């Protein structure tokens, strides 16, 4: 399944995503095109806290201005080259995937959808890295739906 097909699928099955409203609020109060990088970083940190509370997960540490965007599973840290919304959402999704590996949190990435959808993020993938298709599509899905709201 291609990424754009996965995004469209997510729009159908993850309509009740907890991430959409906080992202809408963030987009309304922050200038993501020409805004100050430090203001963007502070906005991402607020979003990080809000999403962590909504999903009831630990708050990942955000470090910016590094060489590569990355999520470190062992420490739960998010590294970003720039404070960008899509990059942050992508890495935050990896954080959710990491926490979902615990049995008691199974289904965390299914956004409250039925149990039938628990495996959707990991089926019919293009990328070999576990969860990469899901993280790319989820970040695009959240932004597209937030822009349309």
Regions found by a protein language model. Give the residues of each.
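A metal-dependent hydrolase signature that marks the N-terminal structural subdomain at the beginning
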Residues: 1-74
């Amino acid at each position: 399944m291609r990424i754009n097909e996965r995004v469209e699928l997510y729009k159908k099955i993850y309509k009740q995503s907890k991430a959409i409203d906080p992202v809408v609020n963030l987009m309304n109060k922050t200038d993501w095109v020409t805004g100050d990088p430090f203001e963007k970083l502070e906005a991402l940190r607020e979003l990080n806290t809000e999403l962590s509370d909504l999903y009831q997960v630990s708050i990942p540490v955000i470090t910016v201005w590094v060489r590569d965007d990355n999520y470190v599973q062992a420490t739960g840290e998010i590294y970003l080259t720039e404070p960008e919304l899509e990059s942050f959402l992508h890495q935050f999704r990896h954080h959710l995937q990491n926490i979902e590996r615990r049995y008691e949190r199974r289904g965390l990435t299914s956004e409250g959808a039925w149990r039938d959808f628990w495996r959707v993020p990991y089926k019919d993938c293009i990328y070999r890295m576990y969860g990469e298709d899901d993280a790319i599509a989820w970040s695009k899905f959240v932004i597209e739906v937030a822009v349309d709201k």
